Amino acid sequence: VKETIYSVMFDRIEAGTYLVAAAVTEGNLKIKNIIPKIIQTEINTLKKIGAKIKATKDEVHIIGNKKIKNMNIKTAPYPGFPTDLQAQMMVLLCKANKQSIIKEDIFENRFMHVAELNRMGAKISTNGNKAKVSGNIRFEAAELMATDLRASVSLILAALTTKGKSVINRIYHLDRGY
């Protein structure tokens, strides 16, 4: 056995979540030590929605835009749009100029976050594997219940955009992935 050095690659869902967080809060964020081509689908999606993104060999810089464009998204295996980023993107699409549709083609029952987002003022309806996301939403602070990892992070992202205090119960789900 010989000594070796190995570096673990970044988590593309975490990176995508941070990019969505910057977009939804109209923030300015630079992520270093990343390989942008691994998350090219996520970068392209955020650009189409209106975020300003510059990628170099090992970093991504995003500036969120107040004006978010609507978009229809379909989850798919890599390199398609990741199912594990669908809830976060739904929060961003609530701020879009028009209705968007998210089609979940990977797993069943992946809209657990919708009821709590609607309690915050979102207007999202689901039918099977499709969610219709109304745009021009301003989230309101609320006491909420996280049901899983994706719901946890989506509620945090929505709460970041509110005035007032939101309380997210059962946030321990977040520990599984972030």
Feature locations, PLM:
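Short, structured segments at the rim of ligand-binding sites
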Residues: 1-178
